[in-house]
Regions:
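Extreme N-terminal leader/targeting segments of oxidoreductases
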Residues: 1-25, 432
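A Rossmann-like FAD-binding core segment of flavoenzymes
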Residues: 6, 86-131, 207-294, 391-424
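Glycine-rich dinucleotide-binding loop and its adjacent helix/turn
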Residues: 9-19, 151-191, 195-200, 306-314
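FAD-site-proximal beta/loop scaffold in flavoenzymes
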Residues: 14, 147, 169-179, 282-333
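Core beta-strand elements of the Rossmann-like FAD/NAD(P) dinucleotide-binding domain
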Residues: 22-24, 135-144, 271-281
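Beta1-alpha1 glycine-rich phosphate/pyrophosphate-binding loop at the start
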Residues: 24-87, 91, 95, 186-230
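A conserved FAD-binding loop/helix module that cradles the flavin
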Residues: 326-373
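Surface beta-strand/loop "capping" patches
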Residues: 359-403
Length: 461
C-alpha cells in the first residue's frame, strides 16, 4: 500500500513548480465507509485504485460515532463506528491501494484534453482529479472517478433561526466531535432541535457526559430518527420529545442563555401565544443533512433536487460517463451497512468500466433502454433516477410522512405494472423495492419514457 500523507510532505514533485501526475484506473474521492468499500471492491476486480481523503485518517464520520449499532447486517455482529471503520481500514492497508491523505480535491476535469493520456489498464484516461496538498499540487488521472464525499449538516443560518448570535450554538455532529474526539464539553445545559438520529444519539451522549438535556424539539408531528434510537436514547434516559415544536429565538449576548420555543400548526408555522422560554447554555441542531456535491456540480454532474445527490443509473453512474456516486453524497442513508452495500456496487461498476468490461455490469448503457424514474404519491424520491439496462433493479425511496397502510406501485404510461404488499412506512427508514427486468421491458414495449414509483395510502376496511 502506498500512503502519501501530505501533512508530512511525503509526496515529491519533479522539477520545481511542476505538477506531479499519477495514473490510476479508479480514483475514489472520500475515505469514509463509502469510499473504502468502493475502493476495496474495485481493487478486488483488478483495478489500480487511489483514495483521496482530506482528513489525516481514513474512516470518515465513523471515527466519532463511538456508539454501537454498526455491522449488524454486513458483519452479523454489533460494532461501534470506529470498530466498523477499522475493519475496512485494515483491509485497505493490506492492499496496494494508494492513499492520498490530508489532500483536498480542487476539481475534476473531464475535458477532451485529458483523453490523450492512458490509464494503467491501457484504456483512455477520461478524468483528471487535481489535489492541493501542504507542499504541492498533484494530478491523478483515471478512467473512472467514484464520488464518496459524504454529507454535511444544515446550520443555523440555513434554517434561519431568529435572535442574537452568541456562543453555544452547535450542529449535533460538531458537538459529537468535540466530546468523542477532542474531549471537550460543549456546555452544561442543552436543548436539541431536531429528532434526526444524530440528535437523538447526542441527547444520550450529552446525558452520559453530565450535560443536562432539557428536551428534544421536533418541527414535525413525528420523530425523524429510527424508532430504536427514540427508545434507546430518549425513553430510556427520561429525555422529553416535544413534537410539532420548534426554536423560534436564540437568547443571549456572549453565551446562549435560553431559547424560545413555539408550537407549530399544520403548515409548520409558529402558533402565536404558544411561546415559552427554556433556559440553557447550549443549542444543538440536528436539522438535516446535505450531500456534499460542490465537486460534482463543477464536474458537470446533474443533481436530483429531491435528494440533492447525483442522478444515477442502475450501476450508480452519473450523467457524466465514468463518474460514479455512492453513499451519503448520493442520498442520505440510515445505516452504514447500507452505505457499504451500495458502495461495493459502485466500486464494481467503476472497475468494470475502467477495465473495459462495462457492458457486463450495466456500466455501459443499453442505447435501446432509456427510462427516467420519478416518485409519486407520498414517495419523496426514487433512486436510481435513470434506467439504462433491462435488468433486475432495486429502487430506493423514502416517504414524506408516516403511514400505517400503504402500497408501492410501479406505473408506466398510467398503467400499473407491479405492486407490493400493504404495509407501514416511515420517513426515517430508507426503503427498497424490486423492479424486475420483465417490468422494465414491458414499459419499453409500451413506448414509455418514464417509470413511476408511487407510494399510495390505503384506506383500512
Amino acid at each position: 500500500m502506498a500512503t502519501l500523507d501530505m501533512r508530512d510532505g511525503h509526496a515529491e514533485t519533479g522539477a520545481t513548480g511542476a505538477v506531479q501526475t499519477q495514473a490510476f484506473d479508479v480514483v475514489v474521492i472520500g475515505g469514509g465507509p463509502a469510499g473504502m468499500a468502493a475502493a476495496l471492491t474495485a481493487h478486488k476486480a483488478g483495478a489500480r485504485v487511489a483514495i483521496v481523503e482530506r482528513e489525516q485518517h481514513l474512516g470518515g464520520i465513523l471515527r466519532q460515532c463511538i456508539h454501537p449499532g454498526f455491522g449488524l447486517s454486513h458483519f452479523k455482529q454489533e460494532l461501534t463506528g470506529p470498530e466498523y471503520a477499522q475493519r475496512f481500514i485494515d483491509q485497505v492497508r493490506a492492499t496496494d491501494i494508494a492513499l492520498f491523505l490530508n489532500s483536498m480535491v480542487l476539481g475534476i476535469d473531464s475535458g477532451e484534453g485529458v483523453g490523450a493520456s492512458m490509464s494503467v489498464s491501457g484504456t483512455t484516461a477520461g478524468h483528471t482529479v487535481t489535489l492541493m496538498c501542504r507542499d504541492s499540487m498533484l494530478q491523478l488521472t483515471g478512467r473512472t472517478v467514484v464520488l464518496a464525499m459524504g454529507c454535511r449538516e444544515r446550520t443555523r443560518s440555513e434554517i434561519k433561526i431568529p435572535g442574537s448570535r452568541p456562543a453555544g450554538v452547535f450542529t449535533a455532529g460538531l458537538a459529537q466531535r468535540y466530546i468523542n474526539i477532542e474531549n471537550l464539553k460543549p456546555g452544561s445545559r442543552a436543548v436539541i432541535l431536531g429528532s434526526g438520529d444524530i440528535g437523538l444519539i447526542m441527547a444520550r451522549r450529552c446525558t452520559l457526559e453530565g450535560i443536562s438535556v432539557e428536551g428534544v424539539y421536533e418541527l414535525m408531528p413525528y420523530a425523524n430518527g429510527l424508532r430504536r434510537n427514540v427508545k434507546n436514547c430518549l425513553d430510556d434516559f427520561g429525555i422529553p420529545l416535544h413534537l410539532s415544536t420548534t426554536v423560534t429565538r436564540v437568547i443571549g449576548r456572549d453565551r446562549v442563555e435560553a431559547v424560545e420555543v413555539s408550537q407549530v400548526d399544520e403548515h409548520l408555522a409558529p402558533i402565536p401565544g404558544t411561546e415559552r422560554t427554556v433556559p440553557c447554555d447550549t443549542l444543538l441542531l440536528s436539522v438535516g443533512l446535505i450531500p456534499e456535491n460542490e465537486l460534482s456540480v463543477a464536474a458537470g454532474v446533474e443533481l436530483d433536487p429531491r435528494t440533492r445527490g447525483a442522478v444515477v443509473d442502475q450501476s450508480l453512474q452519473t450523467v457524466v460517463p465514468g463518474i460514479f456516486a455512492c453513499g451519503n453524497v448520493l442520498h442520505v442513508h440510515d445505516l452504514a451497512d447500507n452505505v457499504t452495500t451500495e458502495s461495493e456496487r459502485a466500486g464494481a461498476a467503476a472497475a468494470a468500466y475502467a477495465l473495459g468490461d462495462g457492458a457486463e455490469t450495466n456500466a455501459v448503457a443499453d442505447t435501446s433502454c432509456e427510462l427516467t424514474v420519478s416518485p409519486a404519491g407520498i414517495a419523496g424520491y426514487a433512486l436510481p433516477g435513470r434506467i439504462t439496462a433491462v435488468a433486475l433493479t432495486k429502487l430506493n425511496f423514502r416517504v414524506r410522512r408516516p403511514v400505517d397502510t400503504a402500497r408501492v406501485r410501479i406505473l408506466a404510461n398510467g398503467e400499473e405494472m407491479f405492486a407490493g404488499k400493504v404495509r407501514a412506512f416511515k420517513p426515517s427508514v430508507m426503503e427498497s423495492f424490486p423492479l424486475p427486468a420483465k417490468v422494465i421491458q414491458r414499459a419499453l414495449d409500451l413506448g414509455a419514457s418514464e417509470i413511476v414509483l408511487s407510494v399510495d395510502p390505503v384506506e383500512e376496511a
